[in-house]
């Protein structure tokens, strides 16, 4: 019986997008683990999850020692690792973010006070290149854990849902996500009444969201996001049922595990009698450091009063003190609608925003919200400096790289400084996802962009502060963002009073409110829509009306922050003289060899003569980067002389033919394959300076017009001006004089 293999599956119906089958299997692989499960997505993506517990508890710890590891195997995608040793090394960013996605809903589902080490190891064994494995891994982790005989209130179901062509699609593929307006991972569990309690959400808009909305798609507003959470619930229910079906056949009975409660009731009661009034008073101090100093003083008084009666129970006194603090903070918010620092529930702390915070860098900004202070720094470079990714994902390069640093001094402490921890990687990824939807395309802005967020001071949501600082820093660097993005952290506190649950949403939470609340969520977005959202809750479900009201409250705060940021900077600045100038030129593919020359002789000579840096793409696009614009132009002229000998230059005149008219001007063909724009403001000159309402009243398709090239932009687009004969005669007369 022990070696018998058991199966269960969930079939997800996506209507016109087809079905997805998630199959769970146990009893065939990793039989010595306490619990093991294999999750398949459509039989060609396979994730093995093994959950193991230590035999003895670590009773000296004051936290639950759960670790989650995701092992990406390159063989899963038919690859050999690209490293020197041709072996998998440190986990990729995708793997680390998946670890966090698994940890967040699973950790609060274990019995409180558990101190046995629990390790969940996920191995990605096979991957369809069009699939995303992260949600499969969350389900696999939950399944192996409920089979392991641990005190765990699972199962937990997780799905990715994306809004594609007006429909919420579960487990979308990479191909389908190209048309998605919004994409989110949702995890939850089924309650006794059959409803689904949402536990964790990680959501974002996509690179194409703005264009799709322009083309008529529905913008991902707060209402749409709430609808997406509801759409995910039936899928989560089906996944939980499949895991429960498997557990009913193969789960081990729940073992006896010692529970180490933080404190006994007698300690809490004695502490409450001893210091409640002093603690209440301390919690009214607005400043973080002053408040914490007073809280430490009250804690010492509590220890002095209680230790004679509770000798050797110092840890319990400390834990009870924290619990009493939490209780008092929550009571004050629920009853008086007043928070730790004296603010009302919707008040935002004092905001400050400035750009050009440090010299010489390509772009910088400083954003402050109360005691949270973030420095954003932008660096621009050639596209060949973008990050190369050797992962299981089909995405092989990343043009926008967002790094987040959280030094220990930001909270007035000492600690390790060095390579980023999982938390820093997670915060950087959240800020990155918030900004990506508003970035210009590679064609519009051919630069690799590195954004660094330095958390110089922390007291509540440095990740959302990073979004604000990054937006301003990018604009300061001259990056033409499609819209400004701001972020805010929200909290939710609930309490049952007279048999009815009361909810209070808090805007701009402090670090302490984050720890003491029932839910925290971070929302970033533009004035029009949400670009990123992260939600974690300890509640067994949030009423839809409460969530909708909290999201609206977050939107009001975001709009206020955007106004403050706009006062500091609202349009892209001129690029820094220290930033490289990058222009593009297109050449015929059959001319690439001539530009490179034998053994690279020609391209090396151009680079040496002009000081420019040249990158050639396979499609004939050439990126020219240089410290000065004149160097880049010199390289462009040399390349055009080789590959585009008929390429027009500024100041040259042509008798062109109008090939197309639009509301903003006329496109004029100068030579085969080379058109320029004669803007409506220039067409006025052909109408004697009169206002032109309709371009075709002056220039129709097929009309001949004498034009001069006024400007060639960084993408090679031509701007034209008309040549007026009378004006030319006047210029000649002036010259003769």
UniProtKB/Swiss-Prot annotation:
It comes from the Bacteria. It is an enzyme of class 2 (transferase). The keyword ATP-binding does not apply. Keywords: Cytoplasm, Magnesium, Metal-binding, Nucleotidyltransferase, RNA-binding, Transferase. Pfam families: KH_1, PNPase, RNase_PH, S1. It catalyses: RNA(n+1) + phosphate = RNA(n) + a ribonucleoside 5'-diphosphate. Residues 580-639 form the KH domain. GO terms for molecular function: 3'-5'-RNA exonuclease activity; magnesium ion binding; polyribonucleotide nucleotidyltransferase activity; RNA binding. Its EC number is 2.7.7.8. Its cofactor is Mg(2+). Residues 651-723 form the S1 motif domain. InterPro entries: ExoRNase_PH_dom1, ExoRNase_PH_dom2_sf, GPSI/PNP, KH_dom, KH_dom_type_1, KH_dom_type_1_sf, NA-bd_OB-fold, PNPase. One of its GO terms (biological process) is mRNA catabolic process. It is found in: Cytoplasm. Mg(2+) binds at residues 514, 520. One of its GO terms (cellular component) is cytosol. HAMAP family: PNPase (MF_01595). Involved in mRNA degradation. Catalyzes the phosphorolysis of single-stranded polyribonucleotides processively in the 3'- to 5'-direction. Belongs to the polyribonucleotide nucleotidyltransferase family. PANTHER family: POLYRIBONUCLEOTIDE NUCLEOTIDYLTRANSFERASE (PTHR11252), POLYRIBONUCLEOTIDE NUCLEOTIDYLTRANSFERASE 1, MITOCHONDRIAL (PTHR11252:SF0). NCBIfam families: polynuc_phos (TIGR03591), pppGpp_PNP (TIGR02696), PRK11824.1 (NF008805). This is Polyribonucleotide nucleotidyltransferase.
